[in-house]
């Protein structure tokens, strides 16, 4: 074998690297066992802090470097954040109240929901339609974009700047998210920008047990501002005038036909004060309601907002949380713009106010926007440090801040100019505190106080230290997996992997005798070792789908060994010596192995690019496994054989057993003659499946429709039909469903699209609370609180053990990506076969057969949904399975076509039909062996891999069966028909390119 030294050197380096990286996992496990022997928790932590692995690496470094476990194995949280591009544009634009700008933004938002065009392109298109003759520079030649956009800039230049600014905002958001996660203390998080999906950031956080807290941390924009304020006695008269204006019913375009009242005049017309949270009268409920409606009519604003007194500083009023929406319409509407001073801005408090008897009463503050650019005189970018602690006077939790020199100077000037007044500390548009300034504050120190908990101050300090988010980021997809479910997945993964591995070992020995079988099995062991080592070095997390990818790569490795051994057996039957037979067996099998592995790699790369989460985990391990299996099966095993043969050993080695010696040998099936019948059966099956699409359709998961999934573990067996009835009452008007995930009817997946279009961060908690209340009312759960119901560790009484959310924009992109990824896979394989075989007949035959393979798998999911004991929903994992079927199925077709190509080259004058028949018969043993060995693996995953992986395993199992049959009965006959016509045009001459490596 040539390049033997390179092979040995590569093997040694891979072995050393794998040992090094995998050793961190063993070191961490050892230190954990030693620490567990120490009873005192503080002493435990001291021990972990003191250890040094190899004298260099700390325990924390070992944790970060060991092989990571994904969410489905360890439990945790996976989210996809989307940075709002429209919000970035609104921040950059000057004329935000311009009608054309507002209309263009609204139309672009609506179009984005159903278009694959990016938001900037859509906005530019609609702005040109709504403002003909106007240029984008009129909107974006602002102080913020000074030096980048000027009044003379062309639209193309402005568009280029906008795209750069959006990308900068996304990059900054990525940095902020990473900083927040690191400061939160998550071990081995996976944070990455999703390529091809503008503004989306994926965050995987294994081990997270507080999803609500993490949602707030990730979505907070950290836009910290310090504002000057109006005093209450200055602001309240304007609110009274606005109340009068609203009561009179004056519209937005009413001209000033009557002279506006002065604030002092309006002050005389005060409504009767209402006691917050109490009835307005002691009469009946009907009278109370009538009086309240009359009060709202006479005083639309001040019947809901209780104003304060003269000593309230910037606090102008109180209101119940239920009235804030109505008040917002009043204070942010058109009338408010005409009545309130241009520099007045009203903001709510972040938390309910202290000193108010009723609950959920929030304060309204009057902010003074008196800067030329409309920005706060001091912002959070001057904060250099933030610490959580306790106020030394009140003992309440607070956040103290330290500013840089510029911030300290401006803070001193701001406080000096506002002695005796309040300065509002505003974070993300809500007021956290508005303390009175008693004197100039120098040194750049300040504190934020409020109704905080210790956890709130920690998260707030973390958020401030990490910096402000350049634009609001919202969670558009989410998955939460409980740690107990993860432990079960680990057990299932280990069992399925171990059993599949043992069965493959037994199968190889049974088919190819002990020594050849064990050498192939040794290659499998080395393959797994290298795969795990490379995964660890990349710091990639091992997931359940990743284990499935690794198991499937074992099938690919077996395929390579089967090809080599079948070739060696052929050479031995021709009477060649062992040394020559081994050399020619490896040489003749190389091109088929190379082509089949490369086509699988093409599919794996497409899976990785278009997939997210579990699909990427599967693709990663599959790609690494394919590369490792090629190296171990083709090169390392050959080194072993050549070493032994050069020493005069194994000269009489047998590559068969009595059982397999004559298996599928010397067969003369006339497959091409059967093609008419097989085409007929194929068309009938295709029509059945297509008919099923129209009649039954496909059960689409939330990946394609958008919505929320909750996997609920009930205490007692519960029928899905009963849960569905309850869901109709819990989420009226929504599409909801319930599906049993186990045989005991205790684990049920609940799906709903309840308010999935809303971007409010409170909707998730709202949906979970509604679900808890509804199930508890129906007697299906007995948890005492919604917090216990949401805790996956508390199983008694019923609880949510995992959850996921997919927003409508993600669902749209998943649908588009699924179609594109399958089409790209087919086109890529068509082109590769065309380049390698240089004959369009093979490309046409393989592509048509692969399309039928995909159709049959999808058709089975339609035909058998509701029949099998597990879900056959179409989700991202299913699309991954279809692509994997395409990648695997092409292997068999490449092997058959490789033999046809070889025979046509050896016997160019022989009958073309005989050539095809003989080639298929010659590779029949390999086809059966490979398919059977792969089916062994897939059946183990199907029955032992757990509910989450069963649909994938079923799709793959059916795909392997269809793929094997289509290689013989679809791909080859079509290639035969196309090639037969081509040969007729060539007057009997055959042109076949030699594509051997």
Across the structure, where does each feature detected by a protein language model lie?
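Interfacial helix-loop-helix hairpins and adjacent transmembrane helices
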Residues: 1-67, 87-128, 156, 635-689, ...
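Interfacial segments of transmembrane alpha-helices in multi-pass membrane proteins
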Residues: 2-4, 399-400, 404-419, 423-424, ...
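Hydrophobic alpha-helical transmembrane segments of membrane transport and translocation systems
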Residues: 8, 526, 533-534, 570-591, ...
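Small-residue-enriched core segments of transmembrane alpha-helices in multipass membrane transport
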Residues: 12-15, 430, 517-539, 550-557, ...
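Non-transmembrane, solvent-exposed regions of membrane trafficking/translocation machinery
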Residues: 22-31, 49, 64-75, 81-428, ...
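Pore- and gate-forming transmembrane helices of large, multi-pass membrane proteins
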Residues: 177, 484-504, 556, 574-612, ...
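Juxtamembrane "pre-transmembrane" interface segments
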Residues: 204, 443-447, 455-503, 770, ...
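Cytosolic juxtamembrane regions of multi-pass inner-membrane proteins
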Residues: 552-599, 640-653, 862, 868-930, ...
